[in-house]
Regions:
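Loop/turn-to-beta-strand initiation segments
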Residues: 12-14, 85-88, 168
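Glycine/small-residue-rich loop that forms an oxyanion/phosphate-binding "nest" at active or ligand-binding sites
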Residues: 74-123
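Conserved helicase motor
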Residues: 65-71, 145-148
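Glycine-rich, flexible N-terminal cofactor/catalytic loop recognition
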Residues: 3-68
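Short active-site oxyanion
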Residues: 35-41, 113-117, 168-169
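Class I SAM-dependent methyltransferase SAM-binding "motif I" and its flanking Rossmann-like core
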Residues: 104-165
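Short glycine-rich anion-binding loops that position phosphate/pyrophosphate groups of nucleotides
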Residues: 21-24, 92-96, 175-177, 202
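A contiguous loop/helix-start segment that scaffolds small-molecule binding in enzyme catalytic cores
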Residues: 6, 11, 167-168, 172-217
Length: 217
């Protein structure tokens, strides 16, 4: 496929760089080269990402780009790329834009005629899906359901929608909310087959293949 043409021939490029979700050996040669050659790395949490960069002896300057500054910081990063700088975007783990910051920056880049390219690599949702033993032909990704404290009505609305969903559903959840979410999904979906994945790519990685009833018993 032909790459999109830059509206501004002098502009830099935004590189969406997937980083390991647990195992440092999963980073690609292409991502490492891009992180070293970029003019600036935009990181979800610079304190977290500095460990990754130090491990691979990457000295590229970093700036923060996260959920709480994504609009104004995206405008700043676009202005830097418009002047010819190349920016690499990373998150704490996985692929930028997949249940992580990135969407707003990509949108502003397209609006400004800045080239965007994605460097494939780790993504927890796809890793979990492929090892789940469930159908991979058709699936939907819900990321984290809204919390009951944050938006109870929106959570209920999504669960109601999922009652009609026949595809494999991928959901993220924190360990301390897992039982509650399993109960809510059980009520919405009935006693389906499920796979609960944890510690993906790490030493204690597990995939628990079961049903809702068995998981909650």
């Amino acid at each position: 496929a032909k790459r999109q043409e830059k509206e501004n021939a002098m502009a830099g490029t935004l590189y969406l760089c997937a980083t390991p979700i647990g195992n440092l050996e999963d980073i690609t040669f292409r991502v490492l080269r891009t992180l070293k050659e970029a003019d600036l790395i935009a990181a979800e949490d610079t304190r977290h990402s500095i460990k990754l960069l130090n491990h691979f002896e990457i000295k590229t300057p970093m700036t923060s780009y996260h959920e709480y500054n994504k609009v104004e910081k995206a405008a700043y990063l676009v202005s830097q790329m418009a002047q010819g700088l190349n920016v690499a975007l990373i998150t704490d783990a996985g692929t930028p834009g997949i249940s992580d910051p990135g969407e707003e920056l990509v949108r502003q880049c397209y609006e400004a005629g800045i080239e965007v390219t994605s460097l494939p690599g780790p993504a927890a949702c796809i890793t979990a899906l492929t090892m789940s033993g469930l159908s991979t032909r058709r699936f939907c990704f819900e990321a984290f359901l809204p919390s009951e404290k944050g938006d109870k009505k929106e959570r209920a609305r999504i669960l109601e929608e999922l009652k009609r969903e026949t595809r494999t559903i991928i959901v993220y959840e924190a360990p301390h909310h897992l039982v509650k979410t399993l109960k809510d999904l059980y009520q919405a979906l009935g006693n389906r087959r499920i796979t609960v994945c944890r510690e993906l790519t790490k030493k204690h990685e597990t995939a628990f293949r079961t049903t809702f009833e068995q998981a909650l018993s």
